[in-house]
C-alpha cells in the first residue's frame, strides 16, 4: 500500500513542484490550502495595496493551487487558520513591536501554523507524512530527525524552521530541499504547472506585501519622540520607535539637517524615554556587539557549551560563536569578532556544520560587558 502524504499547497511554484515530486516518488498525495489572513476581519486597511483589488491575493493563490492540484490529479482541501494565526502569530508580532523589538513572523508562522495547526488538522486524514515546499532537508536515518540546510544556500530556510521541536519534524518531508531554485522552475515548466513563472511570495508571512509603517498603524498608535545622537544632541522628531530597527538607514530624513555628509543609521532605542538614537557612518562602533542573551530556546539533541556557528538574521553569513547555557531555555552567545546590528526580537539560529540544532530569541545585546540601548 502506498504511503500517504498531506502537503501544504500554497499556490506557489515551490509547493507545486514538491507535490509533483512526491507523486513521482510513489506516494498517495493529497493537498491542503491554508487561508490564514482576512483583511476585513483583521482590520487590515491602512498600508494595504491590494485593498481594492477585485480578487484578494489569497483567493488568487487558492485558484493557482487548484489549477496545480487538478493538473496533478490530486485532491485539494481548504482550511482556515485565521483565528489561530491571529492568536498565535500576529498578536505576538504586535506585542513585540509594542515592546520596541523587531520580531520575525516567519519563524512563528512555521512553528505555530505550518507545523502545529496544520499537523493537528492533518490527523483526521491519518497521513504517514506531511510535506511542505521549504528549502531545507531532513535526515530521518537516525533515532531523531535532523534539520539540514538546503542545497541552494541562497534559498535555505532552516533559519525560519529553527524553532521547531524534534517531534514536529518527525514525520515531515521537504521534497525540494535537495534542488536549486532554478531546477524547481525548470521542472515546473517542463510539466506545464500553472505556477511555473509565478513570482516568489514576499512580505509578511501569509499576509503579503504591505506599506509597513502604515500597516502597523492599523494596530498600534504612533508615538512621536526625540531623535538624538548618543551624546544627547537633538536632531529632529521621530514618528514612533516601532518604525525603526537597529542599523536602519532608510526613512530617517536627516539629510541636509546636519553638517556631516555621512549617511545616518539607527544605533539605539530607549523605550523608557521614547528616544531614537542615530549616528553617522555604517561602521559606527555602537552598532557592534560581542555578546547576546538568547531566550526561549528550542534545541534538538544534547545541550552542550562550546563552539558553533550562528545566523542572527536570515541570509547572514555564518558567524563563529561560542555558547554557554544558563538554564534549559537560555544561553549566552559570544562572538569576539564583533557583529553589526544584532537586534533584539530577531532569532539567533545555531548550526553544527550543516545541521541546524536550534535557536532562540535575541533578548539583550552587549559590547565589552555593557548593555546596548537596542530596546
From Swiss-Prot:
- The answer to whether keyword Nucleotide-binding applies is yes
Q: Which domain of life is it from?
A: Bacteria
Enzyme Commission designation? 2.8.1.13
- Which amino acid positions bind ATP, per UniProt? 8-15, 34, 133
Cellular component terms, GO, for this chain's entry?
A: cytoplasm
Q: Which residues form the active site?
A: 109, 205
- Write down the chemical reaction(s) this protein catalyses: S-sulfanyl-L-cysteinyl-[protein] + uridine(34) in tRNA + AH2 + ATP = 2-thiouridine(34) in tRNA + L-cysteinyl-[protein] + A + AMP + diphosphate + H(+)
Q: What class of enzyme is it?
A: transferase
Q: Does the keyword tRNA-binding apply?
A: yes
Subcellular localization, as worded in the UniProt entry: Cytoplasm
Q: What is the protein's name according to its record?
A: tRNA-specific 2-thiouridylase MnmA
UniProt source species: Acholeplasma laidlawii (strain PG-8A)
Taxonomic lineage of the native organism: Bacteria, Bacillati, Mycoplasmatota, Mollicutes, Acholeplasmatales
